[in-house]
């Protein structure tokens, strides 16, 4: 050939040669592209710029990197995109053959990566950083810096493997090129970089270790290489060692597992390389014996058919231990852990999960090509084994698993209810059976979010601490794992701790509200994952100005599981009734759905519900503006509005109320419910509405009317405010010490029968044999009949209850007598005249006492007559001790028996002491008889001021001795003289008594000594019947005239029921054997059952409220019922009973009472309600079901403050979809824009107002997702218009949602409590603020008027 020909020949060449060469290239290219899992790339010049063309943009945040690829102009189907990720690199293959990939600048969390489709033919990759807060200067590493981590070698059972020889005949020219390129010479190079031809087509997979049994004692023998030849093992060669290190030490993601066995196990190490065909370090398979002939033939056959030479021979009995499988896990409540293992196309017939107390093992086979490509040499018949050593013990018998199309779901039941904080046990503990486990250096699966949630990585400081804790664990492993566990960059350079980093937020145990799965028809998934600022369910609501009532209701309803799931995926649009005049045309339903999404996306710290408020205000003008309203009222209107928007009834028929007319209740109730559903049929009705039975009874004709009505919530009344009254109970016999009881009664509308009934149960005495009396100033103020009101009785008043003898028991008439005690001489000292105020000058001018009361003194009768008009109302004897009632049969009413009873009762309330006898005192027989008339006259004239007026001339004056001689200096005897009663509280003035000159008692009158001795008096047995009595007994008749009783021996006394008795103690010091007497605190025993009555006085239970709700009541006159039989309005008796209970039960505690426009009140008493297992079986008389109607609490609305101003908050949890006893998100406190976690024990407070209960084991079936035309076939062409209308409303509300700014802060503009104040308005409405302050000032003035005028009148009326 000529030179020119030789020069141009290679370019042009003969036509036949060029055509043959082109056809050969096309055939080779088609063969390579048709093979599944081929790791080789075809070096084509046109694919070199693919990477630059695909990469559109990338950006990073503190914890993730987002890469956007330009795929094309049309929609992208994620099913056709093949993406594989490791912690260091990735590769993305498109359906048209294009691909993108590379080695990242730093490590990522490959298990948390996401591939998302976007509008405009974009593909978005979300790559969570393994090291948060680490700034990446570039997305990919430069080509010259992608080096391996030196020093890692492959080992087996603690010994290094022999070096692997390079095959001499494997394209030496290519090997030289790879040797010059450090990046391509490593065992695992850049993936999909697209930097030049021949780049690897798939990602560098994690190292898999395959195990095969071999005879003990046999060494490793040659096996088939990539070309079908057995590689030889070289020894002590630098080149071989370097090749071994490059093969056995891939960076970061090499993971190896060893399976323990009784026989020796041979190690098979398989790794996908950069270029399987041309790489000099081709993967080999180490075996313990020569391959079988059948296997060798199979390998040759696969190579002849163009199979991948790097793939292992498929063996049905091979077992591959996996150190890591893509998974995540989360704790489902305190008792379970859910693990999701993401492997597709599982062969269910040969896959299973084995559970033990400390671990579980997943054994499976898969046909997923992407998974098999990550494990070279594995095929559909390969058995994979993944064993996880658990952090704590489990119950193997209660653990379950199930297979889905894309994953395996494993549910682990904890042995103890506690928080694990992670799934796997620390690496130093090893796996069960003695095998070592290579634990990933990244965060544990529980550190990631549950499925569907965004990543919540640790802060840099916490990540550094986590690495420091795991470093000694990795080093403590034996040498068998040194070549498996790769070091992370954190072990070289720990991130600098940031002192300003906030503490991590609580872990969310529930996935956020999921969106519809992305498909080829739907690529409009929101880009909200990158905007998350809080955990799902922790978004607050901004207070727009006294709108805390609305915020608390919305937060409670958003945690209603069925309602939340119903609105999350737009399937409710099929049920929107756009033509309902009572609704909003779907705007309220769609606005509520938009708000629910905002609360569960986690993209707002606080969201403004202004659009929903505007929609509600457009239908209910009372909610216009920013004034306070009742939360229950707003909740009822909101649910009713949602019901009307979702009402399935297009044309409501006319229905009438169904009455019983003697038919069975079951028939009438079902008929009434069906009639209600003819007009009201929606998801709100299915979820919230129940049915109760209303029974009306006419008081005149006894006509009974029974109807069945629906209810949305139960307004249960609270028991009225209670007061605790101390009651002193006296038994029928005086030898029993009085007992003090504490009885709770209502502050309003209480009667004496409540106290008598309560005491009757305590002392086991019939109520008709008890008498209740009030004591004021040591005398009976009044004796209550059972019907008498106790509203005017305060807890400080003294109430005595006496047991009386029953006439049925005595078989004769029983005499009941009131007895009061008083001294013969009052203990009040007299130092001056009551009329002229002149003090006593000398002994000759002694002041004379009034003989009626002995409490005042006068100079003469002139002063007495002058002072009588003023003294008349106060002239009464001085009483001491407590009065009491005695009941004696008429036949046994003797003086001795009466004296015995009186002395027995009196000793509990007075202290009596009789000093030793002194001979110098006057005897009774030596007294002048003239003084008897004086005393008799005085006694007859003694009485209350209510009797007939007495002229002053009829009164007698007695002359006491000088006050200096009254014995005021007398003291009690020493304590060693005998059992002297306590003198505490007894002053010297009380001991002083002025003796009366010449005024003795009746001569010769003696009273037999009662059987019971008076405390403080020491006497011998022979002198018991010889001493004088210590008191006298006087009879007081109906006209208040007193007469001293005489001892008639065994003859019964003649006393009527209209008289009373007075016990007069002989305390005149001038008389023989006088006594010292004074009042004392009543001696009594405390009732042990009343110890907690005071604490329970202000506490009620929900059962008590439900009992009041179901108790019959009489209708008020303005609510009178029209009796169809009497043809008149009657104040009938009405009773409500529960018949049908809903799935979600709302209970309103009626804390607010409105008596009038001015008089309003709120009850702040504690109502104890169960958080778990509210049993309503005793209140529900209707549905007889096998399962009891048990409910669990999931939300509470609280109200703080009073009627004028207050604040609403809410506590809620998100119950599990299948069990209301478990929570997917725990209890949180919603205080407007602030959301914090709370303990379940803090939910029950005295401020609870509205309770939300969810029924156990009674889920509500959601309606099937159908098109609007399918649900309403009668609409015809209007279905498309309705659907487009819903779409327009969605776009409008979502656009307004984006324009609404976020809340100003966690506390909102009004602080933690939004007491009434001016709302945040603009300057265009200044008059509204003035009007608001004017209204507030008026209300404050009315309150002050009530407190200053009406309250004193009410407080004084009780004393009248």
From Swiss-Prot:
Species this chain originates from: Mus musculus (Mouse)
Biased composition (Basic and acidic residues): 28-46, 170-181, 462-478, 1259-1274
Transmembrane annotation, as ranges: 1334-1354
Subcellular location: Endoplasmic reticulum membrane
Gene that encodes the chain: Usp19
GO cellular component, one term: cytosol
Keyword set includes Cell wall biogenesis/degradation: no
Binding locations of Zn(2+) 2: 850, 853, 871, 875
Protein name: Ubiquitin carboxyl-terminal hydrolase 19
UniProt-recorded Gene Ontology molecular function terms: cysteine-type deubiquitinase activity; K48-linked deubiquitinase activity; ubiquitin protein ligase binding; zinc ion binding
Lipid bilayer topology: Single-pass membrane protein
Chain positions covered by the region annotation Disordered: 1-46, 163-239, 432-482, 965-988, 1259-1281
Role this protein plays: Deubiquitinating enzyme that regulates the degradation of various proteins by removing ubiquitin moieties, thereby preventing their proteasomal degradation. Stabilizes RNF123, which promotes CDKN1B degradation and contributes to cell proliferation. Decreases the levels of ubiquitinated proteins during skeletal muscle formation and acts to repress myogenesis. Modulates transcription of major myofibrillar proteins. Also involved in turnover of endoplasmic-reticulum-associated degradation (ERAD) substrates.
Active site residues according to the UniProt entry: 548, 1207
């Amino acid at each position: 050939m000529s030179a020119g020909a030789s020069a141009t020949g290679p370019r042009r060449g003969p036509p036949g040669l060029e055509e043959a060469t082109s056809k050969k290239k096309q055939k080779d290219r088609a063969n390579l592209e048709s093979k599944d899992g081929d790791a080789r790339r075809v070096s084509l010049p046109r694919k070199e710029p693919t990477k630059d063309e695909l990469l559109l943009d990338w950006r990073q945040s503190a914890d993730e990197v987002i890469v956007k690829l330009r795929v094309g102009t049309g929609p992208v189907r994620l099913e056709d995109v093949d993406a594989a990720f490791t912690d260091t690199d990735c590769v993305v293959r498109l359906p048209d053959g294009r691909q993108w990939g590379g080695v990242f600048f730093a490590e990522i969390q490959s298990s948390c990566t996401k591939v998302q489709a976007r509008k405009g033919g974009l593909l978005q990759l979300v790559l969570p950083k393994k090291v948060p807060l680490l700034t990446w200067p570039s997305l990919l590493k430069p080509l010259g810096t992608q080096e391996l981590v030196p020093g890692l070698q492959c080992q087996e059972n603690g010994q290094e493997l022999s070096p692997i020889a390079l095959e001499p005949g494997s394209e030496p020219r290519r090997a030289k090129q790879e040797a010059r390129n450090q990046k391509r010479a490593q065992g695992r190079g850049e993936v999909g970089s697209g930097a030049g031809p021949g780049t690897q087509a798939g990602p560098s997979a994690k190292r898999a270790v395959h195990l095969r049994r071999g005879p003990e004692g046999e060494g490793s023998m040659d096996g088939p290489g990539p070309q079908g030849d057995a590689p030889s093992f070289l020894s002590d060669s630098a080149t071989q060692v370097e090749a071994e290190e490059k093969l056995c030490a891939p960076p970061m993601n090499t993971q190896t597992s060893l399976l323990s066995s009784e026989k020796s196990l041979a190690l098979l190490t398989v790794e996908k390389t950069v270029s399987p065909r041309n790489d000099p370090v081709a993967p080999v398979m180490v075996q313990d014996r020569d391959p079988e002939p059948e296997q060798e033939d199979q390998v040759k056959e696969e190579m002849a058919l163009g199979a991948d030479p790097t793939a292992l021979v498929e063996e049905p009995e091979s077992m591959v231990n996996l150190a890591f499988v893509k998974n995540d896990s989360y704790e489902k409540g305190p008792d379970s852990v859910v693990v999701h293992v993401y492997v597709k196309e599982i062969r269910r017939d040969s896959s299973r999960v084995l559970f033990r107390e400390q671990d579980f093992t997943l054994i499976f086979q898969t046909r997923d090509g992407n998974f098999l490509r990550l494990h070279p040499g594995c095929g559909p018949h390969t058995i994979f084994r993944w064993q996880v050593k658990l952090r704590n013990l489990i119950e193997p018998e209660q653990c379950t698993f199930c297979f889905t199309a894309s994953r395996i779901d494993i549910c682990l039941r904890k042995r103890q209810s506690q928080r694990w904080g992670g799934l796997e046990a620390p690496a130093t503990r090893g796996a069960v059976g003695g095998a070592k486990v290579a634990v990933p250096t990244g965060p544990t699966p529980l550190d990631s979010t549950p499925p569907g949630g965004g990543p919540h990585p640790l802060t840099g400081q916490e990540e550094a601490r986590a690495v420091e804790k795991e470093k000694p664990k990795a080093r403590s492993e034996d040498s068998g794992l040194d070549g498996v566990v790769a070091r992370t960059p954190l072990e070289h350079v720990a991130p600098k701790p940031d002192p300003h980093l906030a503490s991590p937020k609580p872990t969310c145990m529930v996935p956020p509200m999921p969106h519809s799965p992305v498909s080829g028809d739907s690529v409009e998934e929101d880009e909200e994952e990158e905007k998350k600022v809080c955990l799902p369910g922790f978004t607050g609501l901004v207070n727009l100005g006294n709108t805390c009532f609305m915020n608390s209701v919305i937060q409670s309803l958003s945690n209603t599981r069925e309602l939340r799931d119903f609105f999350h995926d737009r399937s409710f649009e099929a049920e929107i009734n756009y033509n309902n005049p009572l609704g909003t045309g779907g705007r309220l339903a769609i606005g509520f759905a938009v708000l629910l999404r905002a609360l569960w996306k986690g993209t707002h710290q606080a969201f403004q519900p202004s659009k929903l408020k505007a929609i509600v205000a457009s239908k209910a003008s009372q909610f216009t503006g920013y004034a306070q309203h009742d939360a229950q009222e707003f909740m009822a209107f909101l649910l009713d509005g949602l019901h009307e928007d979702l009402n399935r009834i297009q044309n409501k028929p006319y229905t009438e109320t169904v009455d019983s007319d003697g038919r069975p209740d079951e028939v009438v109730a079902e008929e009434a419910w069906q009639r209600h559903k003819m007009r009201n049929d929606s998801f709100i009705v299915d979820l919230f509405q129940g049915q109760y039975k209303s029974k009306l009874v006419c008081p005149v004709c006894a006509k009974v009317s029974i109807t069945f009505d629906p209810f949305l919530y139960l307004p249960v009344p609270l028991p009225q405010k209670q007061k605790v009254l101390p009651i002193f109970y006296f038994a029928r016999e005086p030898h029993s010490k009085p007992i003090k009881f504490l009885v709770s009664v209502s502050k309003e509308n209480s009667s004496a029968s409540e106290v008598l009934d309560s005491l009757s149960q305590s002392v086991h005495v019939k109520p008709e044999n008890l008498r209740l009396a009030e004591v004021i100033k040591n005398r009976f103020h009044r004796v209550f009949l059972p019907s008498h009101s106790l509203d005017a009785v305060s807890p400080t008043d003294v109430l005595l209850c006496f047991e009386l003898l029953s006439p049925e028991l005595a078989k004769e008439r029983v005499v009941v007598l009131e007895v009061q005690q008083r001294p013969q001489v009052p203990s009040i000292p007299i130092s001056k005249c009551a009329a002229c105020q002149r003090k006593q000058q000398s002994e000759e001018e002694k002041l004379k006492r009034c003989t009626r009361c002995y409490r005042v003194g006068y100079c003469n009768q002139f002063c007495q007559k002058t002072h009588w008009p003023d003294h008349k109302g106060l002239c009464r004897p001085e009483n001491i001790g407590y009065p009491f009632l005695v009941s004696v049969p008429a036949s046994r009413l003797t003086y001795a028996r009466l004296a015995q009873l009186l002395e027995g009762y009196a000793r509990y309330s007075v202290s009596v002491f009789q000093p030793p006898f002194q001979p110098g005192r006057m005897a009774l027989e030596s007294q002048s008889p003239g003084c008897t008339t004086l005393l008799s006259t005085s006694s007859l004239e003694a009485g209350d001021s209510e009797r007939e007026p007495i002229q002053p001339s009829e009164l007698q004056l007695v002359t006491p001795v000088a006050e200096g001689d009254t014995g005021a200096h007398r003291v009690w005897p020493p304590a060693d003289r005998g059992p002297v009663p306590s003198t505490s509280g007894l002053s010297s003035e009380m001991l002083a008594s002025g003796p009366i000159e010449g005024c003795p008692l009746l001569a010769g009158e003696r009273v037999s000594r009662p059987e019971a001795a008076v405390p403080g008096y020491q006497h011998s047995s022979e002198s018991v019947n010889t001493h004088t009595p210590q008191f006298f007994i006087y009879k007081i008749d109906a006209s208040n005239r007193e007469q001293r009783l005489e001892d008639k021996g065994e003859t019964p006394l003649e006393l009527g029921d209209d008289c009373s008795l007075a016990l007069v103690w002989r305390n005149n010091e001038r008389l023989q054997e006088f006594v010292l007497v004074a009042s004392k605190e009543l001696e009594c025993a405390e009732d042990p059952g009343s110890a907690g009555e005071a604490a329970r006085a202000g506490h009620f239970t929900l059962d008590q409220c439900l009992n009041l709700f179901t108790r019959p009541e009489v209708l008020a006159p303005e609510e009178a019922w029209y009796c169809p039989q009497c043809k008149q309005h009657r104040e009938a008796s009405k009773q409500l009973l529960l018949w049908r209970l809903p799935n979600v039960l709302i209970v309103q505690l009626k804390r607010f009472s409105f008596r009038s426009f001015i008089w309003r009140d709120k009850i702040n008493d504690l109502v104890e309600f169960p958080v778990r297992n509210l049993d309503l079986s005793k209140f529900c008389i209707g549905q007889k079901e096998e399962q009891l109607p048990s409910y669990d609490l999931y939300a509470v609305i609280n109200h703080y403050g009073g009627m004028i101003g207050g604040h609403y908050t809410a506590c809620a949890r998100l119950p599990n979809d299948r069990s209301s006893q478990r929570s997917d998100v725990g209890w949180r406190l919603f205080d407007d824009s602030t959301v914090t976690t709370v303990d379940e024990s803090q939910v029950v407070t005295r401020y609870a107002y509205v309770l939300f209960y969810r029924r156990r084991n009674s889920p509500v079936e959601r309606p099937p997702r159908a098109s609007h035309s399918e649900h309403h076939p009668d609409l015809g062409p209007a279905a498309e218009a309705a659907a487009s209308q819903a779409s327009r409303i969605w776009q409008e509300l979502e656009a307004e949602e984006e324009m609404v700014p976020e809340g100003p802060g966690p506390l909102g503009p009004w602080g933690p409590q939004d007491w009434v104040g001016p709302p945040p308005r603009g300057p265009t409405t200044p008059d509204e603020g003035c009007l608001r302050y004017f209204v507030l000032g008026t209300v404050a003035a009315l309150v002050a008027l009530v407190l200053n005028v009406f309250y004193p009148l009410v407080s004084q009326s009780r004393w009248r």
